Amino acid sequence: MSAHTYKKFENSTSGDLPDKMTIYQDCMNTFNESPVNSKRCRLLISRLLRLLAQGETFPQNEATALFFSISKLFQHQNDPLRQAVYLAIKELSGISEDVLMATSSIMKDVQNGSDLIKPDAIRSLTYVLDESTAFSAERLLKSAVVSRHPSISSAALCTSYHLLPISEVTIRRFTNETQEAVLDLKQFPNQHGNSEYYPNSTYISQYHALGLLYQLKKTDKMALLKLVRHFSENNSMKNQLAKVELVKIVNDLIYRDPQLFSQFRPLLSDWLSNKFESVQLETAKLITSFATRNSRLVAPELYAAAISALQSLLTVPRVSSRFAALRILNRISMVSPEKIVVCNPELESLINDSNRNISTYAITTLLKTGTSKNISSLISTITNFIHDVSDDFKIIIIDAVRTLSLNFPQEWKSILNFLIDVLKNSEGGFKFKNSIVEALIDIVSFVPQSKELALENLCDFIEDCEFNEILVRILHLLGKEGPSAPNPSLYVRHIYNRVVLENSIIRSAAVVALSKFALTKNDPTLYESIISLLKRIANDKDDEVRDRATIALEFIDSARNKDDVIAQNLIESKYFYDIPSLESKLSSYISSNTDSFATAFDVNQVRKFTEDEMKAINLKRKQEQIFNQKSETTLDTTPEAESVPEKRADANSFAGPNLDDHQEDLLATKYADELLSIEQIKPFGQLVNSSRAISLTEPEAEFVVRGVKHLFKDNVVLQFNITNTLTDIALDNVSVVCTPEISDEAELEELFTLQVDRLLPSEEAACYVAFKKLDEIVMEGFLNNLTFTTKEINPDTNEPFDGDEGFQDEYEIDSIFLNAGDYVKSSFTGNFSATFDELPCEEVAVFNIQEDLSIQEVVDKIILNSSCLPVESTQFAPSDSNSHTLKLFGKSALTGSKVALQIKMIKSSKGLALKVHGKGEDSLLCSDLVNGLMQ
């Protein structure tokens, strides 16, 4: 039937849906006619299915009436019509009542129907059977599973798979038949007679049978092992999807028990050379993802073979295979870029691939494999390419280059020249240009030696920039960084041009930027010029511009002639407020208004950061984004990836909580607010530092406890967050007894303990133990016991029974350690080597770690213990090297004194040797941090 004839009741060029009520009435009338017009019925069913496919639905009573009318068409022996009927039954069964009435008609077709409609009838059983009626189809399904016809067998296996959650007992009765179907090479009738009506068999029933068999045996590890051994022998699998499923079963097994990997090594090696590209891809994906989590169990030869297989797939004609191989290599490049350097020639050839998804993936993968030796050549390779792609792909490439600039700050010149070239010479929209400017801002912030060149080029760019938002950002950057540059007068001319030539939004931003140059110490002669310009601008016709110029003049006069510190800070800000904390405090201030705002908002209660601290926070967040990307590459390939639980806000990990930055900052503010609201702790003064929360019990324990260390100038407060997971027990008088490990030489004096009066089931509360420090820096370990009185809960009142005195008990929890890292905050330095050489105090220590830890695991532990900021991207240890140097920088949370660590690591058969070289302004902090680094 031609498409024109089939669609004669619709406008073939229109996307409009047919009227729902018209279709309903036509169906009800036509399906009940006698004799049945099969051609007309098929047409109406197709129009009905189109409605349902587009999201239209019918009320339950109308859907049920349609279902009954359609079920009458079972009496017609036209096979094409019956096929359409089964499609309609499938769609209507979810919104109709009493669908079981069609079961007998479907059963007849399953038993006596032709080979054409029998598979459709079997598939529709899924939608009409329930737990009470599924057993009636057992015999029919069992015989269909072992049918010699591939379509019938596949339909029965798929139906059984979908009935498994409904009636598992019934489906388990034909496990043996399912296992036979895996090895049975089913073929269509007359396949060898070259009949035009039957295609060659793809043996898809093997895949369906194996999928069902896995679901039946997935809880039995030994059964799965036997299944893999049995089906991997003698090349019995002919269908490539079945072979891919077998690889996934192996992946599931080694995910549960990594020690099984050695048993499958020969099999995996054989699969890497399989004739099917999909099998090679799935096997390479399995090996590389497993190696990310268990590198010691994967032989270098096998890993190299997996990379070689992916490398060969980069040159195959099939686009999907090239893309899949490239995607796996891209994931590897996030974790171990050095291992795919051998693929660079193939990756470079894909840069000009006609498929832009492939070409973009190729270039971003190449950039991730960059080292200090080949960055220049990579940048030159993509310079011409980037001008020929769309903005979306350009942004992806710029983001990759931005990451490269953070990983290799010493190569800033070639990266900066590339970004400037693209910014000036490439056409693109706002998002593209903004991504380049963000990358340049990162380079200026985190690579100080690049500042002068970057700012000069940005000055040239704003002369022709068409985007207001980007102009405002660049003007803000010039106002922030320009006054401290060697030649600040260079930027004043460009900024003033914007005041003269642009609209009010740009001119307002330019006035603010211009005012910041008045107090620059690098060129005091600028003062008179800036004052003259601002006085001229103060007569501007636009009030936004005029007001800013007027207030800037007032601030400058107060700061220069009256030594007004507040005015000077407003012009040259030395501190940055914690924005999430400020937002939270303002929201609380507005919502708790009791005196019509007679009491002014106290900005001193908001956390402030110095410029170095702010840069350290921003750099650490960017590093954690890269770290999280690497973690995702391992999660994406595990069988349980979708069920990985979300981390708590106070989870303990180097990479930080699995939250956005806003929530993470609010957590620190929450701690400070809770402590300052406690009367006994208020006299301690301002909170200096808080640690990350540390798990002190197992997550599945009866009482889940997490500890947080809070540091004040002369005091230490230990906070214990306790969760009662028992459902019928309440805890009274809950407290933690903290005993210093070295009690006879304790440098802490316990002041008080704040207990929790009552902790009901599923509730969480905090108890506190406060100490007075006898020295400025105290390092101590605490043995902890949770003490409480248990009382049984009355389920009617959800309170303990009256008169129940309870039972006193205690619960030992893990120790908590106060170390030197708790006295340190992350801080940023643009030139680590120069800063390290300038610091006066020095301390050296050597450690020999006997535990079987990788260099990366030790790096993570050191960063967590020291609380310092890793610089020059040394937080990522190369996986193919036995040595690494970690560089850390921080400041004392108490005094602000600088401390820097340079840690050299060498791994050998005897263990891991560490040489820690620390330098700082405070000899005591430097010594304690170096010597207590591995505690």
Curated annotation (Swiss-Prot):
Record's subcellular location: Cytoplasm; Golgi apparatus membrane; Cytoplasmic vesicle, COPI-coated vesicle membrane; Endosome
GO molecular function, one term: structural molecule activity
Disordered: region residues: 630-656
GO terms (BP aspect): endoplasmic reticulum to Golgi vesicle-mediated transport; intra-Golgi vesicle-mediated transport; intracellular protein transport; protein secretion; retrograde vesicle-mediated transport, Golgi to endoplasmic reticulum
HEAT repeats: 258-296, 337-372, 373-410, 412-449, 524-562
Gene Ontology CC annotation, any one: endosome
Assembly description: Oligomeric complex that consists of at least the alpha, beta, beta', gamma, delta, epsilon and zeta subunits. Interacts (via C-terminus) with GEA1 (via N-terminal region) and KEI1 (via C-terminal region).
General function of this protein: The coatomer is a cytosolic protein complex that binds to dilysine motifs and reversibly associates with Golgi non-clathrin-coated vesicles, which further mediate biosynthetic protein transport from the ER, via the Golgi up to the trans Golgi network. Coatomer complex is required for budding from Golgi membranes, and is essential for the retrograde Golgi-to-ER transport of dilysine-tagged proteins.
Family statement drawn from the similarity comment of this UniProt entry: Belongs to the COPG family.
Protein name per UniProt: Coatomer subunit gamma
Gene (UniProt): SEC21
